[in-house]
Amino acid sequence: MTKITLFPHNFRIQKQETTPLKEKSTEKNSLAKSILAVKNHFIKLNSKLSERFISHKNTESSATHFHRGSASEGRAVLTNKVVKNFMLQTLHDIDIRGSASKDPAYASQTREAILSAVYSKYKDQYCNLLISKGIDIAPFLKEIGEAAQNAGLPGATKNDVFTPSGAGANPFITPLITSAYSKYPHMFTSQHQKASFNIYAEKIIMTEVVPLFNECAMPTPQQFQQILENIANKYIQNAP
């Protein structure tokens, strides 16, 4: 076993200390380059999403107003229109229709996801309404399940009630809301604004996907919504 004596001017110890310093310096430079590369990558992604607003500065300016006679004088205050325009551009960047035209499987999955989201939304909404009126929801669930099955949605039957396998939230809303929140977080401070942006996101998505239903036997989201509403209204009107 080698015994190390800690003398102040021991050459061996000094040499062992300087070598790691060079390695550490090299590692530090390499890490800095990696961090810079990642940072530049995300800057490019963000620039791509906001490109429309940079190239159309005049349009954006017309959708803002300014505080005058205060500390914030001259600073643009964003309006809902600017945020909604950004969400619309984000939807165009996702390019649902373009992807669907190139990939039939993607188109089919998109149609099923959209109609399943419509089913989930209105099932919950009308179940709560029927329950509040003291109406048994079992027949309603059975009938809207049959409507979903007739619309061509895949799913499973349990206790004589069909449920679409993809029932859940609209999968395209989250990307729009997340992108808008990341760019304009101060526009999502109130529940009213959040709800307004969610409604708008759903509206433009439903409009965007309509052409995907033109070449198949499935009802459009709007038609399927009307089918569910008609079923619910029948139970409400026939309630004692």
Swiss-Prot record:
Major localisation: secreted
Tagged with keyword Coiled coil: no
InterPro entries assigned to the protein according to its UniProt record, in alphabetical order: SopE (IPR005414), SopE-like_GEF_dom_sf (IPR035949), SopE_GEF_dom (IPR016019), SopE_N_dom (IPR016018)
Taxonomic superkingdom: Bacteria
Any GO molecular function: GTPase activator activity
Location within or outside the cell: Secreted
Cellular component terms (Gene Ontology): extracellular region
Keywords: GTPase activation, Guanine-nucleotide releasing factor, Secreted, Virulence
One GO term (biological process): actin cytoskeleton organization
Region of interest called GEF catalytic domain, as start-end residue ranges on this chain: 78-240
Biological role: Activator for both CDC42 and RAC1 by directly engaging these Rho GTPases and acting as potent guanine nucleotide exchange factor (GEF). This activation results in actin cytoskeleton rearrangements and stimulates membrane ruffling, promoting bacterial entry into non-phagocytic cells.
Family: Belongs to the GEF (guanine exchange factor) SopE family.
Miscellaneous notes: Encoded within a lambda-like prophage region with similarity to GIFSY phages.
Protein name from the UniProt record: Guanine nucleotide exchange factor SopE
Origin species: Salmonella hadar
